[in-house]
């Protein structure tokens, strides 16, 4: 006898909440952080899944743009400079991360139009 009773099914392999939701980010860890962080007395079952999905999407978006910046600079490795270029050149990400300083990121190349040399109109 297996000890499961009459009609009980065999216990299936444990499946993580991340794999159930089709995510790479850890739903269980996000849930633990939400509970520990004093954001509320109770945390619903869907909240950590949603938050993990949002974090995964934002990370993928930034990495995609940073990868493009690295390829434009003929590099195969993403460095903080590429992250800075990716975030600051994207309008929405720049608005979201406006107050964030990326270490070793540098600045965007920008010359004010007033400082540029004036074009002389030589007519031949």
From Swiss-Prot:
One of its GO terms (molecular function) is DNA binding. Monoubiquitination of Lys-119 gives a specific tag for epigenetic transcriptional repression. Phosphorylation of Ser-2 directly represses transcription. The modification Phosphoserine is found at residue 2. There is a cross-link at residue 119 (Glycyl lysine isopeptide (Lys-Gly) (interchain with G-Cter in ubiquitin)). It is found in: Nucleus; Chromosome. GO terms for cellular component: nucleosome; nucleus. Pfam families: Histone (PF00125), Histone_H2A_C (PF16211). Residues 1-18 have a biased composition (Basic residues). Keywords: Acetylation, Chromosome, DNA-binding, Isopeptide bond, Methylation, Nucleosome core, Nucleus, Phosphoprotein, Ubl conjugation. The keyword DNA-binding applies. The modification N-acetylserine is found at residue 2. Signal peptide: none annotated. The modification N5-methylglutamine is found at residue 104. Residues 1-21 are annotated as: Disordered. Belongs to the histone H2A family. The nucleosome is a histone octamer containing two molecules each of H2A, H2B, H3 and H4 assembled in one H3-H4 heterotetramer and two H2A-H2B heterodimers. The octamer wraps approximately 147 bp of DNA. PANTHER family: HISTONE H2A. Core component of nucleosome. Nucleosomes wrap and compact DNA into chromatin, limiting DNA accessibility to the cellular machineries which require DNA as a template. Histones thereby play a central role in transcription regulation, DNA repair, DNA replication and chromosomal stability. DNA accessibility is regulated via a complex set of post-translational modifications of histones, also called histone code, and nucleosome remodeling. This is Late histone H2A.2.1. It comes from Psammechinus miliaris.
